Curated annotation (Swiss-Prot):
The lineage of its organism: Bacteria, Bacillati, Bacillota, Clostridia, Eubacteriales. It comes from Desulfitobacterium hafniense (strain Y51). Belongs to the GatC family. The gene is gatC. Allows the formation of correctly charged Asn-tRNA(Asn) or Gln-tRNA(Gln) through the transamidation of misacylated Asp-tRNA(Asn) or Glu-tRNA(Gln) in organisms which lack either or both of asparaginyl-tRNA or glutaminyl-tRNA synthetases. The reaction takes place in the presence of glutamine and ATP through an activated phospho-Asp-tRNA(Asn) or phospho-Glu-tRNA(Gln). It comes from the Bacteria. This is Aspartyl/glutamyl-tRNA(Asn/Gln) amidotransferase subunit C.
């Protein structure tokens, strides 16, 4: 499968990119090179390869939540520009 110059121009238009003539040629060549490499990978015999979902055999590596001592709420809120009901008060965004 080859990508044509027109396809690169179309994708650039959709992405709102203004490519020079040189960039069009370069991007077309690079994309075709990537597709050629992907085509080579399709030809590999993977019958003896076990299917995997992850490249690294890690499982859940999260730790348990643990409450640790921290600053008192009053001390933290004392540094806030504005606080209300024990929380930081911030300007409404939406």
């Amino acid at each position: 499968m080859k990508i044509s110059r027109e396809e690169v121009e179309h994708v650039a238009f959709l992405a709102r990119l203004e490519l020079t003539e040189e960039e069009l040629v370069t991007n077309t060549e690079q994309l075709n090179s990537i597709l050629d490499y992907a085509a080579m990978l399709e030809k590999l015999n993977t019958d003896d390869i076990k299917p995997t979902a992850h490249a690294v055999p890690l499982h859940n590596v999260l730790r348990e939540d643990q409450v640790k001592p921290s600053m008192a709420r009053e001390k933290v809120l004392a540094n806030a520009p504005d606080a209300q009901d024990g929380f930081f008060k911030v300007p409404r965004i939406v």
